[in-house]
Amino acid sequence: PDANAAFANIARTPFATSKTGIAVNYTPWLRDLSVNDVFLASLAGYYKITDGQAISLGLRYFKLGSIQFTDAQGVELQKYNPNEFAVDLGYSRKLGKKNSLGLAIRYINSNLAKGTFNSVNYKAGSSIAGDLHFYHHGAKENGQGLNWGLTLSNLGSKISYSSDATQKDFIPANLGLGLAYTKVFDESNKITFALDFNKLLVPTAKLDSLSASGQRIPTDASLAKYRDQGVASSWIKSFGEGGGINNEIQEVNIAIGAEYWYNNQFGFRAGYFYENPNKGNRKYFTVGAGIKYSVAGLNFSYIFPTGSGTSRIPLSNTYRFGLVFEMGGKK
């Protein structure tokens, strides 16, 4: 694991082979829509206090570009530059030789709008959330074997963008399970196959009305009842909504991937992400490559265009660039 574990599963960090790690990532966003001023950037790092303990820090910043606000009649009001950021602080430690546990706390700031529009005072939203991560390291000393992890992430308070106390919404809490098996052929060649499952722990509002365009939407009463639910109880209710087991299966996103490394210096990756058509219908292929030299590593990935017309995903043709540094020798 490298410093990017701060965003996926920090319980992996105590098994890192270097004492200190840093990761920097940059992703131009929505380039397929000819948007040039939107990007996602992240910075992460870890420090191993002992062989079995580590602390980690993560920072994510999302710049949404310049947006022109209008009123209900389409009259231009003002331009605004929305942005969001999250700061994570985590601690992880080994539980025996093969298991580990990680805890993280996160501050979220979502500055989408400010000012008064249509008699409503809008402000930046904020929330405090936490993560609980578990990791099992089943690989042998040469790296071959099965590793897996379980995560409960973004468990936190509701967020609101106005002075109206009834307009608070749930943040996207998530349950994740990931597995990765590595086959080592010799000292120069190895390949890893990975499989991830993710489910949002957020209930669905009852869609008991129709919009002017014929879309199913919640009534004001249903939306108020939905927002009135407690945070902790909403995580449980996200499993017991209408539709039975078939609905629960549809809510699980699936991602598969493979990574090949030659001489621990040159890496090649490919993956596929699937989301049920009734739950968002995101489907795309990815490819990537990595190169390591001394303490530094460079990573690159690309999302292939998928779909057409209204079904084309906005993230088509998205590139991601990353730098990884591992320092301090072995710990």
Where are these regions (language model features)?
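Subset of outer-membrane beta-barrel
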Residues: P1-K331
